[in-house]
Amino acid sequence: MKMKQWWLMLSLLASLFLAACKDTDEYTVDPRTNFEALWKILDENYCFFEYKQVDWDEVHDRYSAQLTDTMNQFALFDLMGEMLAELKDGHTNLYSSFDVARYWDWYQDYPPNFYDDLNELYLGKDYKIAGGLKYKKMHNDQIGYIRYASFSSGIGETNLDYVLYHFKDCKALIIDVRDNGGGVLTYSDRFASRFTEEQVLKGYIQHKTGKGHQDFSEPYPVYLEPTSYICWLRPVVVLTNRYCYSAANDFVQTMRIFPQVTIMGDKTGGGSGLPFNSELPNGWQVRFSACPMLDPDKKLTEFGIDPDIQVEITEEDLARGVDTIIESAILYLQGIIDKDQ
């Protein structure tokens, strides 16, 4: 199934899903009514209960026991946020007019392995900008470096053509998506399509078919189409850390399929559930993972993708203004360049 066909189908599914999820109760701020509505929405539609081995009934009973009829909205919000945190899911949030409940332990409990000030030293002042990409030549102009900080920042086909043409005399490429928390999946596919000359199976996707925790459709194949523009088949290293999430995780998953690509750095943060939104009777919004996305082996990457080569920034290098991960990528690519000469 081609990507455009799949996303059209997915949009239709989303419309049906949102219609089904919309709570029919009238507006109310009653704590128990809203608590039960939130629990039920997740119970019937969240996609990772079995994978994460979460006993949602037990979670319900534990948090329900803490409810009181006189609980104010702030205490209720905190309680609901704590309940959602049991899912350990960066795509699952509760939104009110005064706060956003979020789970960030998936990256905050790990070494950063990326520092903005350090990256600015490597970019210098003479880098170029094309859409959401910053890019320059490194290592005596032998290696191209691309920094993509967020898949929420757009990249067009013309942007990518200019970038890759700029590197036409380079022998290899570094793509740095560390600290990229995700964004638009279309940009992930558009970028990744520049590294293949043929259609590739990038993975599978499922949707809920019922209210049970294991009620899913059969996995639908999702293919990445090759670009009709400039294509790069020379060696590539993609740099990762734990803050690579959602669309960035998807990009890493796709890039690791290609034979000329090596993933280097730290394990990604994951985020392989396509999120949807629903509404509670008091008007609060809830976002959660609803459709699992699988890799070509039909495995989930919700908890992250291991790099091909594990590298972390050392304290000694950081003190000297050296990015251990970039330097390791340069050394690795130089070895390939020397071997090919």
Where are the language model's segments positioned?
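Proline-centered flexible-loop/turn and helix-kink motifs
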Residues: 8, 12, 46-47, 168, ...
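Structural motif
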Residues: 13, 138, 165, 228-231
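C-terminal alpha-helix
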Residues: 328-336
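Bacterial Sec-dependent N-terminal signal peptides
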Residues: 1-28, 341
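Short beta-strand-initiation
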Residues: 11, 130-132, 273
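Flexible, low-complexity junctional segments that flank or bridge functional domains
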Residues: 20-208, 213-221, 235, 277, ...
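Juxtamembrane/interface motifs at transmembrane-helix termini
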Residues: 97-99, 308, 323
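Conserved acidic, small-residue-rich alpha-beta core segments centered on
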Residues: 186-320, 327
